[in-house]
Structures are given as structure tokens and as C-alpha cells.
């Protein structure tokens, strides 16, 4: 890459059409298009890219725990960004427990997807779908499918640690935490005006 990163607004597409190739080929910039009016025409971006990258590197080098720590760091950043989209965690007042727990739950699910899902399924939509599926009531009294899934992991698995507050909550509180996570993901995916992520 050449020089500093920058963002240029281009409402008509003239900048990209006239200078995109030059910027790419002559100045070696990575040029990406984000079209909010027509998201399917945008360049793709996998929010879980860095989590997946470091999780894969850790799987190849299991002795280097710094790689797994990086995957966990990026999973936490993604979850925090999606849960606290406006950046102000203090604004949630009495509901702070649910938002904090939803952040931990989402971090946990992101790590599970990065570690165990098939490569083509390792993206944010899979996080949404997995949380939705795991919300279903189970045949075990007092536990939903998410809790049963995490029970299958070793006690020292970080996915269990991140989900700790949610795992220790009662049935109703756990359902609220999962609903909060789904709600925040849902608001990220679509805004009702065509500017959201296409599922």
C-alpha cells in the first residue's frame, strides 16, 4: 500500500470510475466500494476476517497462544461494536447487565464460529443464525441449547469465559440476553431503508 488510508465520498461514482484504476495500479492502494443504496454492488467485507485469520494461525501453531489471544481480542471488538453501536455503554442504565451479557455471548458465538464452522460459514450472518437456533427451548429444564452447547466445551475454553454472565443467568434473563444480541445484530443487518446488509 502507498501512503495513508483515506475515505472519499463519491455519490455519483465519478471518482471511482475515473480514478479507481489509477489509484489501484499506479499508487498500489486497495480500493473498495461501499454502495449503501445497492449493497449487492459493494465490495465484500467479512467482519470476522481477522478472528478467522488468527484462529486458523493458532490451529496451525497451537503452542503460540498469542495468536488465539488476537482472535479473542478481535471477536470482543466486533461484539462490542455491534452491541454498543453508538459507543456509549453508560446510556443503557438499568439494562446494562443485558447489554454487557449480550456482548459476552456474542463474543463467545463469534469464537465458536471461527473455531468450529466450515470456512464458507465463518461470517457474521452465521453468528446471527446460531444465536437464533440456540435460543430454542431444550428438553433439559432450566437450560437452553446455548447453555447445553457450552457444557460440551472444556471448562477452560474461552467461549465459556466470555459467556459467563449469560450462562449464570436464569431462564428469563438468559432469553433477554439472547434477544438483546439478536436485536443488535438485526439492527446491523437491515435498517428498513435498503441500507443494511443483505442476508
Predicted regions and their residues:
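P-loop NTPase motor domains
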Residues: 1-199
Amino acid at each position: 500500500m502507498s501512503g495513508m488510508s483515506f475515505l472519499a465520498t463519491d455519490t455519483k461514482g465519478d471518482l471511482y470510475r475515473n480514478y479507481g484504476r489509477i489509484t489501484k495500479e499506479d499508487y498500489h492502494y486497495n480500493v473498495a466500494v461501499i454502495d449503501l443504496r445497492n449493497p449487492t454492488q459493494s465490495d465484500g467485507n467479512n467482519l470476522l476476517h481477522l478472528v478467522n485469520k488468527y484462529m486458523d494461525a493458532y490451529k496451525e501453531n497451537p503452542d503460540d497462544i498469542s495468536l488465539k489471544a488476537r482472535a479473542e481480542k478481535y471477536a470482543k471488538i466486533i461484539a462490542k461494536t455491534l452491541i454498543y453501536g453508538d459507543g456509549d455503554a453508560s446510556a443503557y442504565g438499568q439494562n446494562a447487565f443485558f447489554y454487557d451479557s449480550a456482548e459476552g455471548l456474542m463474543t463467545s458465538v463469534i469464537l465458536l464460529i471461527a473455531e468450529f464452522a466450515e470456512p464458507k460459514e465463518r461470517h457474521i450472518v452465521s453468528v446471527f443464525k446460531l444465536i437464533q437456533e440456540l435460543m430454542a427451548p431444550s428438553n433439559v429444564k432450566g437450560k437452553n441449547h446455548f447453555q447445553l452447547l457450552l457444557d460440551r466445551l472444556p471448562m477452560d475454553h474461552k467461549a465459556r469465559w466470555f459467556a459467563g454472565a449469560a450462562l449464570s443467568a436464569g431462564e428469563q434473563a438468559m432469553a433477554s440476553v439472547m434477544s438483546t444480541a439478536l436485536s443488535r445484530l438485526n439492527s446491523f443487518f437491515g435498517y428498513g431503508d435498503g441500507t443494511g446488509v443483505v442476508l
